[in-house]
């Protein structure tokens, strides 16, 4: 299971128990999974790469090698956000060990035919995508084009770092106006600690 950014393996703590021990959560033993939740290179517990070239494809190759070294002949991969990109690359590389992938942020565009004669439902979806591109994706542009400018600013200001990340929790969780409706304060602070570490490495 691969996380995204801003994110960390902390995001998975509520699903690990039910997946690895379903009996303890009113499930059946046959539904149990082994879960491997690595931190992306340079995030959380993973060291910052010392060489260039650590893009999505390289991480996908390394994740497959990790699974082999851990003794898994077959596995499934799941990812969200950047984890979706890594997981998609695992599937596309088709190295033989991965039996299937699941992504919760698929990278797919609308079919050209749908754009030529969009339905009302298509228009609602396209309007939402445009709104996100215009008003919700600024963080991505900043992080992808000027990461060090942002990194120096955030590492120098704990309040700036907290505000930058908490705004994402506000926008991206179904929190009904307050992130603590979804995550308690300890969970938010633990996430903030894991998410802040890569900023210091920028």
Model-derived segments and spans:
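Single conserved hydrophobic/aromatic residue that forms the stacking wall/gate
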Residues: 193-202
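Amphipathic alpha-helical substructures
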Residues: 171-191
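Catalytic cores of eukaryotic secretory-pathway lumenal/extracellular enzymes that build
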Residues: 1-2, 6-154, 160-162, 168-172
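P-loop NTPase catalytic cores that bind/hydrolyze ATP
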Residues: 158-161, 187-189
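Mature extracellular catalytic domain of secreted serine hydrolases
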Residues: 134, 149, 187, 191-193
